[in-house]
């Protein structure tokens, strides 16, 4: 079943792009000036947001993923993005609990030796759960909410929304979530933002490397994970933007509805098609092979679905 998406256009993002897209080329093309990182604290749990400079006509996609049969068509193309901040790591179990007062993860004990349980990525979260988390995190830090979910003509009050009120089955109201990218709160990355961050200023196939034999240094995937998640920011190297686990550990939800191919070259701050059945997931996981861990590999799942191999990270405006 297809669901119509109510989208609030990015207000003023074109102006942000014009002001922020100063030429400073890197291997992936189009990168702008450096953007400062930011560390936040919620209920004593710290997390870091890494600055990603605005980009003009940056290179995304990959020739290995030019056909739909290769995991959702994502041929080489260009995209322009306003500056943003993205989580240094996937959302951890401890941060999720601090915001949502809930621990949904299946990997909730027996961490790998030398790893801390609460710093493993949260999993078994739906796209709906991510929307609620983002708004609740924004409220806790005094920021504007990026998402509006309207039920019976009235917007949900996320400050009082109970965890068990988040739908566990397909829900038209949540599928029609309105997104305002001009707000300064937390949200899911768009597919384009996610891929640009994963590439880390390079044209590498995976986050951190272009060499298959070196992937083990950057990613937890089926060849080295031991069939479980691992503490974020532990034992693996970051990519060129100092982001951890953009390849592997858990798949990551994005904002966009899944479509058969990525947008054509030349778009600015694309947010995907207006409706669909599946929401985008990226990055591969502890369960997946190296092909699915590639920066350009695309997949999708129903927004109410959960999995032990799926989590998320957040973004926000500077």
Residue ranges and their predicted role:
Residues 2-3, 17-43:
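Bacterial Sec-dependent N-terminal signal peptides
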Residues 2-11:
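Bacterial N-terminal signal peptides that target proteins for export
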Residues 10-18:
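Hydrophobic helical h-region of N-terminal Sec-dependent signal peptides
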Residues 31-53, 57, 183-186:
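GGW-centered surface loops in extracellular recognition modules
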Residues 59-83, 100, 107-112, 228-235, ...:
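Short, polar loop/linker segments at the starts of domains and inter-domain junctions
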Residues 62-67, 80-209, 258-260, 318:
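Active-site microenvironments of metalloenzymes and redox enzymes
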Residues 73-77, 202-203, 225-228, 246-318:
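Surface-exposed recognition segments
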Residues 169-181, 216-247, 273, 299-304:
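Short, well-ordered junction/capping motifs at the entry into regular secondary structure
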């Amino acid at each position: 079943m297809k669901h119509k998406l109510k989208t609030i256009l990015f207000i003023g993002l074109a102006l942000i792009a014009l002001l922020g897209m100063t030429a400073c080329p890197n291997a992936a093309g189009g990168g702008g000036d450096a953007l400062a990182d930011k560390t936040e604290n919620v209920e004593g749990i710290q997390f870091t947001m890494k600055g990603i400079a605005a980009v003009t006509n940056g290179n995304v996609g990959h020739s290995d993923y030019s056909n739909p049969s290769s995991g959702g068509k994502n041929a080489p193309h260009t995209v322009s993005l306003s500056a943003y901040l993205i989580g240094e790591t996937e959302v951890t179990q401890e941060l999720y609990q601090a915001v949502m007062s809930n621990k949904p993860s299946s990997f909730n004990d027996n961490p790998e030796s030398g790893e801390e349980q609460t710093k493993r990525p949260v999993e078994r979260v739906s796209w709906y759960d991510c929307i609620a988390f983002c708004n609740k995190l924004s409220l806790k830090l005094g920021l504007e909410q990026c998402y509006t979910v309207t039920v019976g003509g009235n917007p949900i009050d996320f400050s009082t929304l109970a965890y068990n009120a988040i739908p566990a089955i397909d829900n038209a109201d949540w599928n029609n979530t309105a997104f305002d990218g001009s707000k300064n709160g937390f949200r899911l990355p768009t597919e384009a933002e996610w891929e640009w961050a994963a590439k880390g200023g390079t044209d590498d196939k995976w986050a951190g490397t272009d060499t298959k034999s070196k992937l083990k240094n950057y990613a937890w995937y089926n060849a080295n994970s031991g069939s479980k998640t691992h503490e974020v920011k532990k034992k693996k190297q970051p990519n060129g933007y100092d982001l951890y686990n953009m390849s592997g550990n858990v798949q990551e939800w994005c904002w966009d509805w899944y479509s058969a191919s990525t947008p054509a070259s030349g778009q600015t701050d694309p947010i995907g098609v207006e409706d669909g059945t599946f929401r985008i997931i990226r990055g591969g996981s502890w369960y997946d092979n190296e092909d699915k861990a590639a920066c350009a590999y695309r997949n999708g799942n129903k927004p109410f679905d959960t999995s032990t191999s799926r989590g998320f990270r957040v973004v926000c405006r500077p």
